[in-house]
Amino acid sequence: MRWQELKDEACPVARAMSVIGDRWTLLVLRDCFRGVRRFEAFQERLGITRHVLADRLRKLVDAGVLSREPYQDGPVRYEYRLTETGRAFHPVLVTLMAWGEKVVPCDGETPPLRLVSRATGEPVRPVVVDEATGEPITPSNVRAER
């Protein structure tokens, strides 16, 4: 299967991967949720080439995940903001963070990045639950079907 063909697949995972399916795109989105909006800031934080960054930002704008808005005239410069579609990616990113912390923990020298509640300051542990029942969703209690 070719990369460009993923968006036409019946599988929602394949279609999602057609939008966010590489490391740079995921890291750009991570930084967006941390408040990064400007091209130079993304480039500095990620160490990514201008060409690759421009490509990933364009794809995210084209997919409706980010919007491109001018913040300066002469020369015109743009910043990138999460759209409603982009903000809907947050639970995926949070779950990926939790998985990464469990499976690929920090080296012990650098403190790990943790999610904490803005209200209490306490650590937050994400759990994927069924909206109707509030029960955790696990491989043993759900299946995919058409």
Predicted regions and their residues:
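Basic, amphipathic "hinge/linker" alpha-helix immediately C-terminal to the N-terminal HTH DNA-binding motif
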Residues: 21, 72-93
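A detector for short, charged/polar N-terminal pre-domain segments
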Residues: 1-8
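Alpha-helical linker/hinge and terminal dimerization helices associated
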Residues: 16, 26, 63, 92-104
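Canonical helix-turn-helix DNA-binding module
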Residues: 39, 43-71, 75
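C-terminal regulatory/oligomerization modules of transcriptional regulators
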Residues: 94, 98-146
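Extended, folded domain segments that form the structural surfaces/walls around functional sites
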Residues: 29, 37-42, 57, 92, ...
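N-terminal helix-turn-helix DNA-binding core of bacterial DNA-binding proteins
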Residues: 11-49
